From Swiss-Prot:
Pathway: Porphyrin-containing compound metabolism; protoporphyrin-IX biosynthesis; 5-aminolevulinate from glycine: step 1/1. The active site is at residue 247. The keyword Zinc does not apply. Its EC number is 2.3.1.37. The gene is hemA. Keywords: Acyltransferase, Heme biosynthesis, Pyridoxal phosphate, Transferase. InterPro entries: 4pyrrol_synth_NH2levulA_synth, Aminotrans_II_pyridoxalP_BS, Aminotransferase_I/II_large, AON_synthase_class-II, PyrdxlP-dep_Trfase, PyrdxlP-dep_Trfase_major, PyrdxlP-dep_Trfase_small. Homodimer. It comes from the Bacteria. This is 5-aminolevulinate synthase. One of its GO terms (biological process) is protoporphyrinogen IX biosynthetic process. Belongs to the class-II pyridoxal-phosphate-dependent aminotransferase family. Its cofactor is pyridoxal 5'-phosphate. PROSITE patterns: AA_TRANSFER_CLASS_2.
Length: 404
């Protein structure tokens, strides 16, 4: 087989469909977020970033960066091993305690990313529990899907956020089989929120475990930043709450929280935890500082919500089509892969606005979009400039002014 030709042909297909991903070469500057410098073959350009998952700008917060610098001075750079073989630093232990407290659980377990935490935890639960059936929301993240698929357990996909469809599928399943209901709180592409209470009611009725991914909600919602489940007073009803340290907390890593026995079970059987080097102590120290701060401070969350409201209001005034949802994610619908990429390129090249186009397979075809994520650091002028640029490009492209 001519492997090189195969690789190139596959890539050519992505180019032709407008789905080839181009990474923006950015240098973020401490203290000036969301501004950054973009590097191209033509030189450097100052841009405003509108698609960061550092939702609250905590990755630039002096509380976090100072904690990380101090940890490097104290501990050095790397963890030095797996968690089992000399790699457990005291910062890991403190961070796991803080995460367990955040979600009202007995225990927590750190992973190297949110992807790995989902893949390893779900893969282990679904492969080790005899005869388990996992009921997975159709909108679940790739990390959850891959973990479930890797386990080779029986899986049932229910319609996205549909309480009725989930109940129908639970009722049709073997009543003797152990069951797991796996879903997210805030879905990253549409920004919609799961009916957590109703799913917990079904879990109680049918004797199922619940597995909730809160990666786009931790730090953002609830009086202490514990996510949607904390805001709704439902943390105690969930078996596993999974989250990330790389979005609102501004650092890197993933985790699960649950009972002491469950976390110890994952710790002892999950290959994605056992056979990898632990997070550097500085990352754990930064995440610890970020979580402690956001447990006490509402300033960042309130400012963030105000920025989201202002952006949505101005988009409405200009007739720019965005999906209405109850979260902080603002999807502006284009509906065509090539046009979505073209608009993103024009925003970057002509207006200094960086918004990454979101195309298939991340979202279904004909729903291509710009996924905009305001932060507390975006000024009124930043928002005005973005909306004005979108208005200009929508007119040039003769795009629809409403979400179908």
């Amino acid at each position: 087989m001519d492997f090189e030709s195969f690789f190139k042909n596959e890539l050519d297909g992505l180019h032709q469909e407008g789905r080839y991903r181009v990474f923006a070469d950015l240098a973020r500057h401490r203290g000036s977020f969301p501004k950054a410098t973009r590097y191209t073959a033509d030189g450097a350009q100052e841009v405003t970033v509108w698609c960061s998952n550092d939702y609250l700008g905590m990755g630039q917060c002096p509380i976090v960066t100072e904690a990380m610098k101090n940890a490097i001075d104290e501990c050095g750079a790397g963890a030095g091993g797996t968690r089992n073989i000399s790699g457990t630093n005291h910062y890991h232990v403190l961070l796991e305690r803080e995460l367990a407290d955040l979600h009202g659980k007995e225990s927590a377990l750190l992973f190297t990313s949110g992807y790995v935490s989902n893949w390893a935890a779900l893969g282990t639960l679904c492969s080790k529990i005899p005869g388990v059936i996992v009921f997975s929301d159709a909108g679940n993240h790739a990390s959850m899907i891959e973990g479930i698929r890797h386990s080779k357990c029986e899986r049932v996909i229910f319609k996205h956020n549909s309480v009725a469809d989930l109940e129908a599928k639970l009722a049709a399943a073997d009543p003797r089989a152990p069951k797991i209901i796996a879903f997210e709180s805030v879905y990253s592409m549409d920004g919609d929120i799961a009916p957590i209470r109703e799913f917990c009611d079904l879990a109680d009725k049918y004797g199922a475990m619940t597995y909730l991914d809160e990666v786009h909600a931790v730090g953002m919602y609830g009086p202490r930043g514990g996510g949607i489940a904390e805001r709704e007073g439902l943390m105690h009803r969930l078996t596993v709450i999974e989250g990330t340290l790389g979005k609102a907390f501004g650092v890197m890593g993933g985790y699960i929280t649950g009972s002491a026995a469950l976390c110890d079970f994952i710790r002892s059987f999950a290959s994605g935890f056992i056979f990898t080097t632990a997070l550097p102590p500085a990352l754990a120290a930064g995440a610890l500082a970020s979580i402690r701060h956001l447990k006490e401070s509402q300033v960042e969350r309130f400012a963030h919500q105000e920025r989201v409201r202002r952006l949505r209001s101005l988009l409405d005034q200009r007739g720019i089509p965005h999906m209405v949802n109850p979260s902080h994610i603002v999807p502006v619908i284009v509906g065509d892969a090539a046009k979505c990429k073209w608009i993103s390129d024009l925003l970057l090249d002509n207006f200094g606005i960086y918004v990454q186009p979101i195309n298939y397979p991340t979202v279904p075809k004909k729903t291509e979009r710009l996924r905009i994520t305001p932060t507390p650091m975006h000024s009124d002028a930043d928002i005005d400039h973005l909306v004005s640029a979108l208005h200009s490009l929508w007119s040039r492209c003769a795009l629809a002014r409403a979400v179908a």
